[in-house]
């Protein structure tokens, strides 16, 4: 199929072949790899430039993860005679490790890695976060501040009822922006004026409510960090019963993106 699609261009299409070493999502099985490589090499409009696999449990199951590493490395090493003969069958790029694989394992054969989560400055494994710097921050601003009495309910379902007079700030962000509704009721916090402030009640589509009683000088327009350097995305994910990958990729298009380049000075 790809060979026929590439034919009109008159140029070979560079392709990578995926080996299924346990993910079950796609690719050829290891014992089918040699035949698949030979078949791709026989097609006039395709050029095999990469060979890779994907680790299904590098952040959860070290004992299992050693198996695809050994299996993949052994497969690549079985192709070494072709490499020594400089045959065009041999892929130029060999890749296996995701972020967890890069941190915890070492391949004998790969020359590329595919870090995803680490590029955001978030570690998939304990013990490495101190060496990484978060590069993505989700922010909003205080839209409204009200003084509410004891017994006043907050948000849908009145899952939060004030047990004391409280200063409540409404923040302009919600699950319509990608902030997870599932975090409701699990003691989430945001950062305002360098102070952690607890969320009250359920996350709504467009707003959240926060107790700012400890911040008497909090003002409308104050910046609010939902996650970033002070509120780790891993904390948000854990309290939302999900994973950092989902938090990062759930931010919706209606959230403005601002890209900053770090100064070299």
Predicted region positions:
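Active-site-proximal beta-alpha core segment in soluble small-molecule metabolic enzymes
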Residues: 1-80, 84, 90-95, 108-109
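Active-site anion/phosphate-binding pocket segments in diverse small-molecule metabolic enzymes
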Residues: 1, 8-9, 66-82, 88-265
């Amino acid at each position: 199929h790809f060979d026929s699609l590439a034919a009109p261009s008159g140029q070979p299409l560079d392709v990578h072949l995926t080996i299924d070493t346990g993910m079950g999502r796609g690719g050829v099985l290891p014992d089918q790899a040699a035949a698949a490589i030979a078949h791709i090499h026989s097609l006039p409009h395709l050029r095999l430039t990469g060979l890779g696999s994907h680790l299904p449990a590098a952040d959860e199951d070290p004992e299992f993860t050693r198996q695809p590493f050994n299996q993949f490395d052994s497969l690549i090493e079985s192709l070494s005679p072709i490499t020594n003969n400089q045959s065009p069958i041999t892929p130029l790029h060999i890749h296996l490790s995701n972020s967890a694989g890069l941190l915890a394992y070492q391949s004998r054969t790969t020359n590329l890695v595919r870090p995803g989560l680490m590029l955001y400055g978030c570690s998939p494994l304990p013990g490495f976060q101190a060496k990484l710097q978060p590069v993505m921050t989700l922010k909003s601003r205080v839209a409204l501040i009200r003084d509410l009495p004891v017994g006043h309910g907050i948000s849908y379902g009145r899952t939060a009822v004030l047990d004391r007079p409280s200063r409540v700030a409404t923040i302009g962000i919600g699950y319509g922006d990608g902030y997870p509704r599932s975090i409701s009721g699990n003691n989430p916090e945001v950062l305002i004026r360098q102070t952690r402030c607890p969320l009250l009640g359920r996350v709504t589509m467009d707003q959240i409510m926060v107790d700012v009683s400890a911040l008497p000088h909090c003002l409308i327009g104050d910046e609010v960090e939902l996650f970033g350097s002070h509120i780790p995305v891993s904390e948000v994910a854990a309290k939302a019963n999900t994973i950092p990958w989902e938090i990062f990729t759930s931010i919706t298009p209606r959230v403005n993106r601002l890209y900053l380049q770090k100064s070299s000075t």
